[in-house]
């Protein structure tokens, strides 16, 4: 059993897999940008997708190349200068944590690669790493050093967009996955609408049949004596002959049996006006579903 997804979840969340001689890494992408790209594809318009990370930061996508095998990106932390002696990191690179970033900054300080007095990790809901600089140190030079010697800059190299198709790995691109996912979503939506259409048409048929059964007093046949139950059912079927053109589908024996098995209480309380209202409501729903099917890409 499979549970179909109507959204390119693989591209939104990203994924990583390792096999013998092969590593696959698909970076996460922005939800809204994926939606916009899907719409552009359906409208036969060009689109470009780049990774986007929940941890924030800045990204150099010049080597991304639509996620083709061997592509690469560089990710940087967002560092701001609070004053001449203080720097603050508010967004961290993808694949790092505030703990690992803090540790890399401390180690760079111990090696003399950057000159700092201390590092405070004030992270709660959002990242906030405060770096206190040593006296006389340039904030701009320290920022450059942080990118050069710590996890404030991370290179993601040899990325590979690979999916399993027919039990075999297949190298592909981000845009190809998005197009396939969008087509699949279109198929799922069409499938759901067709199921809904069938259900509504079936409901319309049954209620219309029931209305004729009571309004034309066909149920009275059940009060007559008959040689057998089959003869009585056959007579009821024939009684519907003048009204078959009012229906959209053929009347089956199961339809007739369903009507014959209704209890007397149901017959006595049947409300023709309510049935007419139900039929009108179903017809309104049918129009909407048919419109949605005809304009599914609009």
Regions found by a protein language model. Name each.
Residues 2-3, 9, 13-298:
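C-terminal interaction appendages of subunits in large macromolecular complexes
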